[in-house]
Amino acid sequence: MRIGVAGLWHETNTFAMEQNDSMETVHIQGGDVLLPQGYVRNFMGGFVEGANHPEVELVPTLGISFSHGGLIHAKVYERCRSMIIDALREAGPLDGVYFAFHGAMVAEAPYLDAEGKLVQEARRILGHIPMVGTYDFHAIMSDYEVESLVPFPNNTNPHIDGYERGLEAAKCLLQMLDGTIQPVTHRVFVPVIGPNIGQSTWSHIPVEERGLLLHQLNLKREALEETPRVINITILGGYGYGDSPDAGMSVVATTDGDAKLAKQLANELARDLWTQRGELQKVRPIYPIDEGVRMAMKRKETPVLLVDLGDDPGSACPADSPVILESLIRNQASDCALTIRDAEVVKAGITAGVGATITMDVGGKIDQRFYQPLQVTGVVKSIDDGKYVICGPTHGGWGRKVVRDTFRETNVGPRIVLRIGNKIDVIFSQRRTGKDRDFFKSAGI
């Protein structure tokens, strides 16, 4: 059996300034490079392991991602879609296809449903062969997709179950190929754009976890999945920053040949979500920056994390906000570490060298709608090439439910550590700021 493998990854913030308006922002992987080598606990790693069968040949085609988190321009999308479709067509006879998606990609009209348009075209040229796909929890899923393939999205937020969903997708595809099952999927759109901080499904703190709406609904979802003939049920968070008709939440249920049951279970969870939607706003309070900094300074347990929801690099924000740094300096905080994306500061620090004192405007240079650059003086503490190893699965997380056995090399480009004020260490990087503790450790913090 020959199974084609293709990928399209992008979480599109349609409000972001940095858009993908040329092929220069496109990253393409092809051939064996597309398939992970060794034991990798992510979607693709799970699928490859699950499809490891003597009679299965995985046929890697193309995987495409993008540099910027903003809107994909129509011409760029058309070119990328054509490249993937051509690669599938040229792969020779295929018995099935696995798509690795993020699921929240938005391109200019008429391609708002970017993944759906790709799946439709793939179905048109490949005919009625079995297809499965893995998706992020924040996927903006459409009816086009569930009509054309069997989806296996994250059940967790923060996302720590990509590997397991990949295994499930592989198992489902192999069973479809041998005729064991005939999946049918039903999707219910729930017109709710939930705040991401209210959409957590688990927590390190048991009492907090019990109060999470999506944790409670996931317990019910897990119980419903034990129903005979049920293959998979998922509550999707959607992605409000991807301004499109399907941006809200949804519930997707897949059964073995029982369309009525799939519809019943999806509707039941969707009703529960809708009637309790107000709970999504009650999870965590949001504090003004100075108040949050002062609260952190009073905490005896460390480390304390300050989360700037307005400049989340994972949601395509510039990651160059200096507002927390400004507050730390103003409140005379000490023993702090943070990251700011600023290529000019990196260049100046490298030129000056370790031990040099520099004065510069930092941050606020990419999107100045909400904050301005901040002038600071600091000592260049270290310089490195930005290559390091992330220990842990997706985003380098350390959730209590994950296996700490994954190591991934990553490269954020040249960076410097600038010590400012009373032991405030700021990592400046040319690309993205880090989403894991190893970003800091590898810089000597």
Annotate each language-model stretch with its function.
Residues 159, 163-219:
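Conserved anion/nucleotide-ligand pocket segment
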Residues 424-445:
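A C-terminal functional module that forms or caps the active site or interfaces directly
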Residues 1-53:
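N-terminal amphipathic/basic leader segments beginning at the initiator methionine
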Residues 4, 9-11, 25, 74-81, ...:
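Active-site histidine-anchored catalytic micro-motif
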Residues 48-76, 80-88:
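Low-complexity, highly charged intrinsically disordered N-terminal segments
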Residues 53-56, 60, 86-95, 292-304:
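Glycine-rich phosphate/diphosphate-binding loops that line cofactor/substrate pockets in enzymes
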Residues 197-431:
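Hard-cation-handling environments
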Residues 15-19, 72, 109-111, 142-147, ...:
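Short acidic, glycine/serine/threonine-rich loops at helix termini
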